[in-house]
Amino acid sequence: MTGTRRACAALAAAALLVSASGCSYLEWKREKKELRRELQHDPRNLLLKREYALHDCFGVMGRIAVPADAPGPLLVAAFDHDSPRHERVGSRAAIAETGYFILLPGGDYDLALFADLNRDGFYDTDEVVGRTPPDSPVRVDAEESRDGLFVQAPTVAIDLHKPSTYEVAVHVKLVPRPFVVESVDDPFFDPKLGEIGVYQPSKFLARTQGWIFSIGAPDTSKVQVILVHGINGTPRDFRTLVPSLDPSRYQVWLFYYPSGLGLDQLGIILARAVDRIASERGSPERVALVAHSMGGLVARRALNELCREGKPHYLRVYVSIDTPYGGVESVSGAVKRGTELVPSWVDVAAGSPFLTRLHQTPLPKDLPFHLWFGWGQQSAYGPGFAGDGTITLPSQLDRRAQAEATSMSGWGDTHVGILSDPKALEALANLLDAATTGKP
């Protein structure tokens, strides 16, 4: 097979998994080539590093010392300490009560917190309410990271009454209630942004400024249900599923992530999000995790992290729907040929190191795990090998996943169609009701 034909075959394999256009993939490859060229000429440029390999970035997190008159949403911004121009490498929304979090490539940074003091809808240069000491930059690298993914940064104290002015211009639009949405129909969940998350994760995160979003104001007295979409997806994939859950009983959370990133990184970030939800004021005692497609691999990785010392008391049930536990064979071929792919595609390749590690850690025996699979439209001879039209049955029913499942349920639906099947949704609601009733 010629190089061109191999590239086309790899592209077809990827498109089968993500249903993304070939144009997006080819554009991504062109951009990567251009970024490589620019980095060769300017290897110290942290902005270029962040764009080129966001999967090699670290999650930088720290606490915020809050005064009595706690502010509304804040902005955390990171500036390149060593650059003469002191460029802003990244910025994200932050909430005083929960701290700040930002993704950054290795380097030395000055961090600053901004508040919209004049209430004009923007964070501006002269609205700095807290910062790290200018002569003590935050070092971000593998040595400072506890687990290769996260770096603990200093606590930043904020003072709303003595704002200062930063050395470089800042003008960033404020996003009111950045982590609360009214429904999955919010324009925020446009499928076009989901595709951007595959190929341009930094652009995706600049838009979302977060990972986990609640439908309506969080209510810790309810059962917390966390939904995880698949590759190239958004929470809008759950448009029919969400209304099927009783709003008086369930608080729905949406894990909204750039699905081109590596699954190890995404799984650990999801684990942190779940743990944060469970530790909110009011201490929710009932948390359910429901994931679709590749989201099941992200969720499974999160569970490995959450259950290092046994099942947390609050975790009541895990449901995966049409998840490729055995990986995707066609993507495996592309990896072996050396085709450049986004990190998540590499991880879902059949036999990938990620999948091997994933299944080496068993789920706690006291965590109910319900494995749902789809076979598309059944023929006269029963379910076919092709599965739901996207993920094969052997991959959905990988023996390692079957061995850990509390129950398995098959549905004659397509890969996405299962999320709107009335019978499947009724069964899911009944399953969640049973699993989350009563004390743990």
Model regions and ranges:
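Extracellular/periplasmic catalytic domains that process cell-envelope and extracellular macromolecules
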Residues: 104-105, 217-220, 246-247, 281-283, ...
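Flexible, membrane-associating and regulatory peripheral segments of lipid-active enzymes
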Residues: 24-29, 35-36, 43-225, 234, ...
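Bacterial N-terminal signal peptides that target proteins for export
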Residues: 1-11
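Serine-dependent carboxylesterase/thioesterase catalytic core
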Residues: 25, 227-229, 252-359
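C-terminal motif of bacterial Sec signal peptides marking the signal peptidase cleavage site
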Residues: 19-22
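Helical cap/lid subdomain of alpha/beta-hydrolase-fold lipid enzymes
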Residues: 304-440
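Short, surface-exposed alpha-helical segments at coil->helix boundaries
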Residues: 235-242, 264, 268, 393-394
